[in-house]
């Protein structure tokens, strides 16, 4: 099991990025959440098998059709909480 915090920067708010991230994560079977951040970025907590989490990280560079991604930062996360689904949360 791999668990990461992903920060996606660029034009990623107001372009349905979170909805598309939700759909992609659920397709992959990755759990966690996606949320808008006050600085205009989007944060994703993703947990699942390492290859599937890596696919979600790769997808972040594409994002939603209207998004323009400038940076994707990934940090390993060691928290104990287990997510059973993937959801959109409010910042």
Curated annotation (Swiss-Prot):
Residues 3-90 form the Acylphosphatase-like domain. Disulfide bonds: none annotated. Keywords: Hydrolase. Belongs to the acylphosphatase family. PROSITE patterns: ACYLPHOSPHATASE_1 (PS00150), ACYLPHOSPHATASE_3 (PS51160). It is an enzyme of class 3 (hydrolase). The keyword Hydrolase applies. The active site is at 18, 36. This is Acylphosphatase. The lineage of its organism: Bacteria, Pseudomonadati, Pseudomonadota, Gammaproteobacteria, Alteromonadales. Its EC number is 3.6.1.7. GO terms for molecular function: acylphosphatase activity. SUPFAM superfamilies: Acylphosphatase/BLUF domain-like (SSF54975). PANTHER family: ACYLPHOSPHATASE.
